[in-house]
Amino acid sequence: MKYDTSELCDIYHEEVNVVEPLFSNFGGRTSFGGQITTVKCFEDNGLLFELLEENGRGRVLVIDGGGSVRRALINAELARLATQNEWEGIVVYGAVRQVDDLEEMDIGIQAMAAIPVGAASESIGESDIRVNFGGVTFFSGDHLYADNTGIILSEDPLDIE
C-alpha cells in the first residue's frame, strides 16, 4: 500500500506525532507502514536476526541504535531476511550498509546514514520496550507510516482509504 504522510498529517494532525527529519530512504519501497515492534541495540545487530525471522506481515521494525553512525545495524543479509518474512519496513536510528543491494529489495528502509563498517553480532539489546528518538516516543503496537517526505506515528491505525 502507498502512504502519503503529508496527506495523513493534514487529515489526522491531532492524532499523529511527526518524527524529526533525520532519515533517508535506503530500501526499494519508498512508502511503507504498519504496526511497530521496537528494539534497542547499540552497534550490535544479533538480536535483529531473531526478530526479523518472525512473520513481519503488516509490521515495521523500529530500531533505536542510539543514533550511532559508526557501525551499520542493517545489511543486505538482514534486509533479505526481512523481505522473505514479509516485513513492511525498518526504521533505523543509526546506520545501514550495502545500500546498492538494499535499494533493490521490496522493503522500506529508513536510516540516518550509510557506512561500510558492520555491527557486532552478540545479541546485546532489548525488544518490545519504549524507545525515544526523533522527538517522539515509540511503543511496540503503535502504528508508523513513512514515505520520502517523512515518518509519522499514531497509537491507532489510520483509515487510509
UniProtKB/Swiss-Prot annotation:
Keywords, ordered alphabetically: Cytoplasm
GO molecular function: endoribonuclease inhibitor activity; enzyme binding
Domain of life (superkingdom): Bacteria
Cellular localization per UniProt: Cytoplasm
Alphabetized InterPro entries for the sequence: RraA (IPR010203), RraA/RraA-like (IPR005493), RraA/RraA-like_sf (IPR036704), RraA_gpbac (IPR014339)
Gene Ontology cellular component terms for the protein in this record: cytosol
Primary location group: cytoplasm
CDD domains, per database record: RraA_family
One GO process term, biological-process aspect: negative regulation of RNA catabolic process
Pfam family name, one: RraA-like
HAMAP family: RraA
Task performed by this protein: Globally modulates RNA abundance by binding to RNase E (Rne) and regulating its endonucleolytic activity. Can modulate Rne action in a substrate-dependent manner by altering the composition of the degradosome. Modulates RNA-binding and helicase activities of the degradosome.
Family: Belongs to the RraA family.
Description of how the protein assembles with itself and partners: Homotrimer. Binds to both RNA-binding sites in the C-terminal region of Rne and to RhlB.
PANTHER family recorded: 4-HYDROXY-4-METHYL-2-OXOGLUTARATE ALDOLASE 3-RELATED (PTHR33254), REGULATOR OF RIBONUCLEASE ACTIVITY A (PTHR33254:SF29)
Name recorded for this polypeptide: Regulator of ribonuclease activity A
Lineage of source species: Bacteria, Pseudomonadati, Pseudomonadota, Gammaproteobacteria, Enterobacterales
Gene: rraA
